[in-house]
Amino acid sequence: MNLTVITLTSEKKDGKFCFFDEMKKIIEHSKVVIEEGDVLVISSKFISNSQGRILKIEKSKVCEKARKIARKFNTNEKFMEIVYRESDKIVGGVAGFAMATTNGILAPNAGIDKSNSIGTKIILYPNEPYKFAEELKRK
C-alpha cells in the first residue's frame, strides 16, 4: 500500500460561499486527479466558513454562566459566551480552553477557532458536520 499526501490550499475567505464549487476550483487549479478510494481531509473551518458560520466576538452579550466559565478557565468572557452557547455540554478544561461537546464531538472551546479568521471574527464549528460529510461523500 502506498500513501501520498498532497496539500491543496485556498485563500482565506471572508463570508459564505459554495463549498463544492470552491473545492472543484481548487482541485482543478491544482491539477490533482481524485480517484476512487482516495481520502480527502478537509478543515472543519473551511466548511464552517463556507456556511457563513462566522461571528464578531465583540457583539456577544455575556451571561453569568459564561462569565463563571471564563473566570474558571482564565479566558475572554465574550469568547466563552460563544463557546457556552455553541456547545452541548462543557465537560472540563484548562487555562485558556474549555473542553466541550458539540454534535457529539469533544473539542477544545467547542471547536471554535480564532486563529484562522480575520480581525475580531471567530469561526464556529460546522452545522450538521456528519450530514455534510455524507453529502461530500456522495458528490
Residue ranges and their predicted role:
Residues 1-139:
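N-terminal and secondary-structure boundary signal
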